[in-house]
From Swiss-Prot:
Family statement drawn from the similarity comment of this UniProt entry: Belongs to the universal ribosomal protein uS2 family.
Protein name: Small ribosomal subunit protein uS2
Taxonomic lineage of the native organism: Bacteria, Pseudomonadati, Pseudomonadota, Alphaproteobacteria, Hyphomicrobiales
InterPro entries per UniProt: Ribosomal_uS2, Ribosomal_uS2_bac/mit/plastid, Ribosomal_uS2_CS, Ribosomal_uS2_flav_dom_sf
Annotated Gene Ontology cellular component terms: cytosolic small ribosomal subunit
Length: 331
């Protein structure tokens, strides 16, 4: 993999160069404005291109080191693109209302996420029949409300290492929280926005649907590049590895997952998965997980259970994705 490539023509076709009406501008964006046409500011794409590349590199580097990226875009035209890009790259997103304290009061947000999980369990299990129709509707409404705000971060497991923002004016609270915690911010900054405090500023139109889709696609591909780099830098000799046999009797675990009683041959070095420490590897081993293929075969529910067991539910999807890649290449 490599950083996603893009051209100035793509930016032009997506309308990235169109700013706001000249009387609505923020003077702090003057250096990124090429000029005005029909009272509309035109963004200097000669600056957008290298600044976008810089942001993509930073995002790829963050993920390659095991970091998490949070996509933030709550305006109507950004909601679908933000959610799709985050899901495609196994990251996290907020595309509805930003709840104040999402970053700075993570403990309280975690409590709300636990409530969301509880409601999911109740409504998706046989226990729901114990409630009246009215009670089930009340629980469903509460669940839907929480899911709109927290569904994209319920598996994050902790604070993100970088946030990517569409429309810095609308998401100013999210940016302020990130700045307060020292979390880097990559953002699309239009001509009516204040660039102050944005770590990786990308001048561009933050309203056009095609432009937003292009930004999100590039960021998602940069994340995937980071995941690929993390695998490549692990030093695993894939050509010398082979898929181990699985005929030994497994040991039952509290999670419902059946692990192995011991490694089949030489165990894989799970620490080479991005973000897995020695302590996490030991927890995997205690659960009977010694090989990449075991992680690769986890379904979504079991993966979440395993993530809860090792204390990092928000990271397990990335590990499963990496393990699938390694297993497929080994075959």
């Amino acid at each position: 993999m490599a950083l996603p490539e893009f051209t100035m023509r793509q930016l032009l076709e997506a309308g990235v160069h169109f700013g706001h009406q000249s009387h609505r501008w923020n003077p702090k964006m003057a250096e990124y404005i090429f000029g005005a046409r029909n009272n509309i500011h035109i963004i200097d794409l000669a600056q957008t291109v290298p600044l976008m590349h810089r942001a993509l590199q930073a995002i790829s580097d963050t993920v390659a080191k095991g970091g998490r990226v949070l996509f933030v875009g709550t305006k109507r035209q950004a909601q679908d693109a933000v959610a799709d890009a985050a899901k495609r790259s196994a990251q996290y997103f907020v595309n509805s209302r930003w709840l104040g304290g999402t970053l700075t009061n993570w403990k309280t947000i975690s409590g709300s996420i636990k409530r969301l999980r509880h409601l999911d369990d109740v409504l998706n299990s046989g226990d729901a029949s114990a409630y009246t129709k009215k009670e089930r509707l009340t629980l469903q409404r509460e669940r839907d409300k929480l899911d709109r705000s927290l569904g994209g971060i319920k598996d994050m497991g902790g604070l993100p290492d970088l946030i990517f923002v569409i429309d810095t004016n609308k998401e100013d609270i999210a940016i302020q929280e990130a700045q307060r915690l020292g979390i880097p911010v990559a953002a699309i900054v239009d001509t009516n926005c204040d660039p102050k405090g944005i770590t990786y500023l990308v001048p561009g139109n933050d309203d056009a649907g095609r432009a937003i889709s292009l930004y999100c696609d590039l960021i998602a591909r940069a994340v995937i590049d980071g995941i690929s780099r993390a695998q490549g830098e692990s030093g695993i000799d894939i050509g010398a590895s082979s898929r181990p046999p699985r005929e030994d009797l497994p040991a039952a675990q509290a999670t419902g997952f059946q692990g192995l009683s011991g490694p089949r041959g030489t165990p894989d070095d799970l620490k080479k998965l991005a973000g897995v420490s020695g302590d996490i590897e030991k927890k995997f081993n205690d659960l009977g997980i010694f090989h990449y293929w075991q992680l690769a075969e986890l379904n979504a529910d079991t993966a979440h259970q395993i993530g809860e067991e090792v204390g990092l539910p928000g990271r397990v999807d990335g590990w499963v994705a990496q393990a699938k890649g390694l297993t497929a290449e080994a075959e």
